[in-house]
């Protein structure tokens, strides 16, 4: 984890504060080509996590990075700040399919700032441009510490350093971290810079003895705000997006994305707000709640907290051929308080309840039931009037239908009833008599509909599986003719199941998926089978 902490401290120290906006470009072998619109001063971060070697080269020759690679927990990053207007195409020498085109609008000429890449072994590789390196961090007292000198790669500081009160930084070329954080007092740390020089920042300028009070790029598409203690990152999320399908309707390109939101910090994330850079691009979302402005974790089911190294997945449809950039605002809390709660509750409750209840009730009830059940076994097949020769006590014994309640019902177990349930629209028929133990309900609604080529009717459906029973649903399978479907996994031709990242629906929980089908009206899911 030390390498991860160093990586994100590096982000905080060397982010270019000239940037008006920050974008993340996923620089993986399976990434689709992207076209972004920015302005001079915007920062582009090339983010790779597929384990392959990559570099970044610009069409105008101004950028040529070293080779970098990374993984999901230790990503490789190469950051560029835009300095001139025009169309700039970025490509990789190692993968012909990787490309990104940036349309840069006019603005004042400012320095181009690049950061080093991080390889999978956690080492730091300086980027190609070489000149005076500098960085400054804002400390809790409001002072700024500036380090200047030639870049070095052994992790120590090079050059001289100076500290001032609340004044600006010193040195030939300075770069001050621009970041936001969830500090304990609720304040947001910001800073600016006024350096006219070309600067190159690498991991070698980090001073482990003087950690910054803030640590993240809040306006980037991939990182939320966080705070740092010692050299550890507390509250930090990373986001990756994968395009699954796209189509064109009425000259608008619609693209389906699956998004992985991973907690790479040290604290559990209780809640998070994702703000799109352009809300008009969001056509539909699932698994998260979208109010037209931002996305949040749902409250109708248990979706949090997101513990360290855990990932939640959601999806959306974009009215564009490229993914939407999200600004993340996570809220974390220390999970040390829940310990005393479970210790008191279980100690007293089980001691009193089982000692008295089972002693009296089971001793009498089972004694009579088995004796009476064996005698009238042949009797239920014939009516009570056939037993003329039996005594009155014998006739009264089989008459109560106590035998019918426990015996026949369990023989047609609830798992059989649920497995053969073919009724799919809400509510799915519960299993025969023990329906409260294993019960799923499917709720479907049409989100949108259209006619393609004035002939083919299409509808977009949002379906939610709700566990209304008393035991978790361990599997849910169904058949669908959907042409596009998301948030479920395919098991065969037109057959699907719960996704591996949400394979069990807890009691009271639910799972939502979506699909697009060629039809004019909504119909039931077919071949539904579920078990608990």
Curated annotation (Swiss-Prot):
Q: Name one GO biological process term.
A: spore germination
Tell me the protein's name. Spore germination protein 270-11
Source organism lineage? Eukaryota, Amoebozoa, Evosea, Eumycetozoa, Dictyostelia
Q: Where is this region: Disordered?
A: 113-225, 328-436
| Residue span of region 10 X 4 AA tandem repeats of T-[EP]-T-[EP] | 339-378
Return the domain comment text from this UniProt entry. A shared internal Thr-Glu-Thr-Pro repeat defines a family of D.discoideum spore germination specific proteins.
Q: Name one GO molecular function term.
A: carbohydrate binding
Q: Which InterPro entries is this protein grouped with?
A: CBM2/CBM3_carb-bd_dom_sf, CBM_49, Cupredoxin, Dd_Spore_Germination_Stalk
Q: Where is the composition biased (Low complexity)?
A: 329-426
Pfam families hit by this protein? CBM49
Query: Keyword Ubl conjugation: yes or no?
Result: no
- What keywords are annotated for this sequence in UniProt? Repeat, Sporulation
Region: 3 X 4 AA tandem repeats of T-[EP]-T-[PD]; residue ranges are 397-408
Q: What are its GO cellular component terms?
A: extracellular matrix
Q: Where are the sequence repeats?
A: 339-342, 343-346, 347-350, 351-354, 355-358, 359-362, 363-366, 367-370, 371-374, 375-378, 397-400, 401-404, 405-408
Source organism of the structure: Dictyostelium discoideum
